[in-house]
Amino acid sequence: MLQPKRTKFRKVHKGRNRGLAQGTDVSFGTFGLKAVGRGRLTARQIEAARRAMTRAVKRQGKIWIRVFPDKPITEKPLEVRMGKGKGNVEYWVALIQPGKVLYEMDGVPEELAREAFQLAAAKLPIKTTFVTKTVM
């Protein structure tokens, strides 16, 4: 699963997920899966969607993952009282703003790409849409 090799700090503040996204254009492939809603994707969800897409296209074409889980989320163990410091890092998330391209695909027909992205979108907790590369 995806996670940073090393970080400057082990734990981070919760923060907010506001604003609009960077990386809103399909830049590597021909087709893309773009976030319509706002939220956070865990490394497991990103991997599950990638596997669903890869199986749908039967390992042909090329897939790019445009998001990376770089924020650690901490949790305290079960039945532990409040206080006594921040919990341990349990998983990593990527913060997603509307307009962010999550995945890209190339080398497959459009119908197959749509089908694959639909299977991937079912694994994700945010609303998404299918986009194609705009030629200027």
Curated annotation (Swiss-Prot):
CDD domains: Ribosomal_L16_L10e (cd01433). InterPro entries: Ribosomal_uL16, Ribosomal_uL16_bact-type, Ribosomal_uL16_CS, Ribosomal_uL16_dom, Ribosomal_uL16_sf. Pfam families: Ribosomal_L16. GO terms for molecular function: rRNA binding; structural constituent of ribosome; tRNA binding. One of its GO terms (cellular component) is cytosolic large ribosomal subunit. Keywords: Ribonucleoprotein, Ribosomal protein, RNA-binding, rRNA-binding, tRNA-binding. GO terms for biological process: translation. PROSITE patterns: RIBOSOMAL_L16_1, RIBOSOMAL_L16_2. Gene3D superfamilies: Ribosomal protein L10e/L16. Transmembrane segments: none annotated. Part of the 50S ribosomal subunit. PANTHER family: 50S/60S RIBOSOMAL PROTEIN L16, LARGE RIBOSOMAL SUBUNIT PROTEIN UL16M. Binds 23S rRNA and is also seen to make contacts with the A and possibly P site tRNAs. Belongs to the universal ribosomal protein uL16 family. This is Large ribosomal subunit protein uL16. It comes from Pectobacterium atrosepticum (strain SCRI 1043 / ATCC BAA-672). The gene is rplP.
